A protein has these predicted regions:
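N-terminal cap/lid segment of alpha/beta-hydrolase-fold proteins
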Residues: 2-41
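Active-site glycine-rich loops that stabilize anionic/oxyanionic intermediates
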Residues: 22, 43, 50-55, 126
Length: 170
């Protein structure tokens, strides 16, 4: 259904959106809204990063949909260089840019008039878990963070798989 790997709930509406991060890369996202959203009220929001190599039409979209059913405004996004987002070469890994994608997502969702800017959280799935935690450390607008099956790519890059590198090696 619309390229998604799951059936979209009839309790939400989905809008495909685009916005740029501070590196000038266009980020593609799906914004999920509770059906019947009252635009005169303020709702908590959550931005959701995909597993490394995944796309918003998979796991991140499922999280976004279920949380929107529960009253959150959610944004499942494709990290730069992946999915429908921009960036060349494709499928490259860039922790600093992936962290910025979380902040750019907060920028975008925070400009929606129905979002409570004091109640924005982030979820990172798998590899995006480390990026979500780092984004929450540097972007104080992110008031809560959660991960699922987190893998810290930055730590693995520095210290080796399961911290296997000695100090002389790094």
């Amino acid at each position: 259904e619309n390229g998604k790997t799951f059936k979209v709930s009839d309790k939400v509406t989905v809008e495909n959106v685009r916005y740029d991060n501070r590196f000038g890369i266009t980020v593609a996202a799906d914004m999920y809204l509770p059906k019947g959203l009252d635009t005169t009220k303020k709702y908590p929001a959550i931005v959701i990063g995909t597993p490394y190599g995944g796309v918003k039409e998979q796991g991140a979209g499922i999280y976004a949909m279920v949380l929107a059913e529960r009253g959150f405004v959610t944004l499942a996004f494709d990290e730069s260089y992946n999915g429908e987002s921009g960036g060349e070469p494709r499928h490259v890994s860039s922790p600093d840019i992936f962290v910025e994608d979380f902040s750019a997502s907060v920028d975008f969702i925070g400009t929606r008039p129905f979002v409570d800017r004091e109640r924005i959280g982030a979820i990172g799935l798998c590899g995006a878990g480390g990026f979500a935690v780092t984004a929450a450390q540097v972007d104080k607008r992110i008031k809560a963070v959660a991960t699922a099956s987190m893998y810290d790519i930055s730590r693995a890059d520095h210290y080796g798989w399961k911290d296997s590198m000695t100090k002389d090696e790094y």
